[in-house]
Amino acid sequence: NPIPILTPC
């Protein structure tokens, strides 16, 4: 994921 803070994984 390019934005790990917005994604749970």
Swiss-Prot record:
Family designation: Belongs to the MGMT family.
Keyword line: DNA damage, DNA repair, DNA-binding, Metal-binding, Methyltransferase, Nucleus, Transferase, Zinc
Role, per record: Involved in the cellular defense against the biological effects of O6-methylguanine (O6-MeG) and O4-methylthymine (O4-MeT) in DNA. Repairs the methylated nucleobase in DNA by stoichiometrically transferring the methyl group to a cysteine residue in the enzyme. This is a suicide reaction: the enzyme is irreversibly inactivated.
GO MF annotations in UniProt: DNA binding; metal ion binding; methylated-DNA-[protein]-cysteine S-methyltransferase activity
Obligatory cofactor(s): Zn(2+)
E.C. designation(s): 2.1.1.63
Cofactor comment text: Binds 1 zinc ion.
Gene Ontology cellular component list: nucleus
Name of the protein: Methylated-DNA--protein-cysteine methyltransferase
Catalytic residues (UniProt): C9
Catalysed reaction equations from the record: a 6-O-methyl-2'-deoxyguanosine in DNA + L-cysteinyl-[protein] = S-methyl-L-cysteinyl-[protein] + a 2'-deoxyguanosine in DNA; a 4-O-methyl-thymidine in DNA + L-cysteinyl-[protein] = a thymidine in DNA + S-methyl-L-cysteinyl-[protein]
Signal sequence coordinates: none
The organism of origin for this protein: Bos taurus (Bovine)
Enzymatic class: transferase
Keyword Metal-binding recorded: yes
Other comments on record: This enzyme catalyzes only one turnover and therefore is not strictly catalytic. According to one definition, an enzyme is a biocatalyst that acts repeatedly and over many reaction cycles.
Name of encoding gene: MGMT
Main location per the UniProt record: nucleus
GO BP of this protein: DNA repair; methylation
Subcellular location: Nucleus
